[in-house]
Each structure stands twice: as C-alpha cells, then as structure tokens.
C-alpha cells in the first residue's frame, strides 16, 4: 500500500514572495489537491542573518492572495518553524556523534580559506580535508584540548562515505546519481552558533513530518545527495524528489534575475498593481507545466483536475511578461464589472478621480485593462490637459480631408440637444458625416478620434465622446481646426 501523499512548501522569511518560489508552492499545492494529499507550510528560519521582519507574514499573505490554502502550517501546528525545532535537531546530531557518523571540527575559517586558496592555486577542486587524518588518539585529544582552550567553537561535520553512490529517480528529470567523493568532503551539519545547516535540518523536518514527495526547483539538485547521505546515516527512507526546471527570461534567454526590470517578479507587485489573483495563479501554473492542447485559460479547479506531474517540462520555463499581461487582460475583460471596479477604485480614489463618471470610465476601459492601475493613464484625457500628438498622429491630422470631416462632425455635435447627447445617438451622427462628405473608413474615424482624444486607438468612440462631454469634445475639435 502506497503511503499518504504529503508535500510541503518551506520558505525562508528572507523577503517577498518571488515568482519562482510561488511556482514551487503552487505545484506542490496542485499535486496535493489532485491526489487528495496534504499540503504543508513550514518556515525555514535558521538563517538568522537573512531573517526579515514580517517576512513570514508576507509570504503567507501572498500565497493566500493567489488562492492557495493549506492543511498544516505554523498557524495551526506547533513547531512548524525551524527555530522552534532546535532540540530535535540536536537530538539527531548527538545520535550521529555517538555513532561515529559525525564529528566535531575545530578548523577555523582562516585555515579553511588558506587551504581553499592552496587547492585553487594547485588546480585542484576545493574540498574539505579531514583535519584529524594521520593523528593518533593522543594527538587528536591534544589538538582538541588546545583548540578548546584557545576558545575555538567547533562545527559538526557529517563523515561522508567517499565511495558511496547517491542516486534517485527524479519525478521530472529521471535517473540522477552523484558519487560521494565529488561533493566536497565531510560537510557541516551544525554551525558554530548551534543552528543546523539547511541540508541537515530539512531532512529531519521532512522525515518528522512524513513528507512523501519533495517538489522544488532544480537549483536544489546539488543539495539532494547531501540530504540522501543524512537519510542513510540516520537509517531513514528518503521521499521521492522532483526538480522543476529553472525559469528564464523570455527576452534574454537567461535565468530570471531580480535585476530584470522588464518583468514583475514578486507577487506583491501584482497585488499592488491590481492584477486579478486568478490570472496570476493561472499564469504561474503554466511555467514549466501544461495540460496539452491549445487552451491557456483555466480556473483553479480545472488546474487541480488537470494537473499531471508527468507533464512537468524538462526544458526551462520562459517567463514572458507580455504573456502574463495578455492573460491578465483576458481575465479582466471577462470578469464581472463589480470585481474590476473594486480593483480600480483605490487607484481612482488616490488620484482624486472618484467622480460621478468613475463607474462609466471603468466600464469604458475595462476591455483594455491589463492591470487595474492602468485606469489612471487611460483616463488622463478626462482629467488632464490634451496630450501632445505623436508624429504618426500629426501625419494623420495633416490629411487633406481632415478639416472637412471635423467641420462636419463639429456641426453635428453642436446641433444635438442635451437630451439627445447619448452614446447610441453619437454613432449615427458620424455615419451622417460619412453620407454627406463621402469620406469613410479610417479617413473618417481616425481624425475624429485623434481630435477628441489625442490618440489613434482607444475604446468605443461614441462612449468616449459621451463621457468627455459635448462641450469639451467640441472644444477639442475646434483646437484641431
């Protein structure tokens, strides 16, 4: 009988939730929900130097915003933060020390640096050389006594089986193996400050929490043999491992970097700009996985039902900001008005644009929005000075029939009563200009649009003219004549 599926997302509270970490959480979430398993949140906070105040809350809030829920976490269970589990780590470190599978190392940072420098100068691969090699028992005891008297605080190192082969069948990449002699020698499992290192603590945690599958980024592949060594030393069965391919920038073809200013890489950024969480969830789910077929828009429930770990990509996932924005626009276009207005309202309020026309403006520009904050630049026409025309727009307005069109349309607007000035009555006036002048198509619509709005493209022209108002529309046209 197969053991229950239990997966975890284990962030460090060292900053905002990055798109790559969000994908790790999301794939674990989808895997658990697809197979009726348990999704666990564990906080890995042993790196005290990089700890960020409020980092844990930020991580959890952004996961919730994306639409993920979990079954176990520090919110519901005790000792789900590594800093609360130090006694447990110490128990297993003491066990390994007692069994001779680990030992205290008194080598200093200066000595390690000097040895590394010597190895590099000699063209050797840097590795730790056991400081006790060649020592008799008496020499070893004397060495330890002298080091302790000098105030040297030891680390604890795992004794590596240099001839061991550490292999696993990866859920994504297939068979992978490492030789024990190629991982850099005996490595530290407990630092001088008493905190365990990541590769030791994560094994104790995963075993204690009965994690069945570890799904993470392929930057962790080099950690896996070290973790398998700990499982072996403690006599525990290792979980299954799956390493997702890295995420690359679609424009540069290089690994996604936090310095890539053309991409929004933190979930907080999407929240602040007014993206729909469902759109971001959908987009991230397709970074390195797809269900097959041409369809790209899926609800959370559909993604859970379709998720198949066998379709995780072996090739890097391309992060395309334009694709994200296209998908976001699809969600906003098809969302109900109340949802989109609620997203736009804070931006309108902050800009002092929460007027009686606010709802109509959101309705007008809803089909164009990629994020709710775009409602401000899109509505500048209604609250700011007329924009400076581009060279392309100036070229259109220099056309020989432009004056004829604008004169005729201005006359139509001036002749409309207040009662008749409605969107449904404005379009017939444009068609009347066409009939009277014989000018049609772009030569008719483009000059009117540019004269009224200062733009070649935009939402439905009659609605724009209506919301701008008859007087202001006429004023803009006069200024173009």
Swiss-Prot record:
InterPro entries for this protein: aa-tRNA-synth_I_cd-bd, aa-tRNA-synth_I_codon-bd_sub2, aa-tRNA-synth_I_CS, aa_tRNA-synth_I_cd-bd_sf, Glu-tRNA-ligase_bac/mito, Glu/Gln-tRNA-synth, Glu/Gln-tRNA-synth_Ib_cat-dom, GluQ/Sye
Q: Provide the E.C. number(s) assigned to this enzyme.
A: 6.1.1.17
Q: What does this protein do?
A: Catalyzes the attachment of glutamate to tRNA(Glu) in a two-step reaction: glutamate is first activated by ATP to form Glu-AMP and then transferred to the acceptor end of tRNA(Glu).
Identify which top EC class this enzyme belongs to. ligase
SUPFAM superfamilies, per database record: An anticodon-binding domain of class I aminoacyl-tRNA synthetases, Nucleotidylyl transferase
Residue ranges for motif 'KMSKS' region? Answer: 255-259
- One Gene Ontology cellular component annotation? cytosol
Quaternary context? Monomer.
The protein depicted here goes by the name Glutamate--tRNA ligase
Looking up CDD domains in the UniProt record yields: GluRS_core
Q: Which family does it belong to?
A: Belongs to the class-I aminoacyl-tRNA synthetase family. Glutamate--tRNA ligase type 1 subfamily.
Report which reactions are catalysed by this protein.
Answer: tRNA(Glu) + L-glutamate + ATP = L-glutamyl-tRNA(Glu) + AMP + diphosphate
Q: Keyword DNA repair on this protein? A: no
Q: Per the Swiss-Prot or TrEMBL record, what residue ranges does the short sequence motif 'HIGH' region cover?
A: 11-21
Give the principal location in a single coarse category. cytoplasm
Gene symbol here is gltX
Q: Localized where?
A: Cytoplasm
State where ATP binds: 258
Q: Which GO terms fall under biological process for this protein? A: glutamyl-tRNA aminoacylation
User: Which HAMAP family does the UniProt entry name for this protein?
Assistant: Glu_tRNA_synth_type1
Q: Which organism is it from?
A: Streptococcus pyogenes serotype M4 (strain MGAS10750)
Q: Which UniProt keywords apply?
A: Aminoacyl-tRNA synthetase, ATP-binding, Cytoplasm, Ligase, Nucleotide-binding, Protein biosynthesis
Q: Does the keyword Nucleotide-binding apply?
A: yes
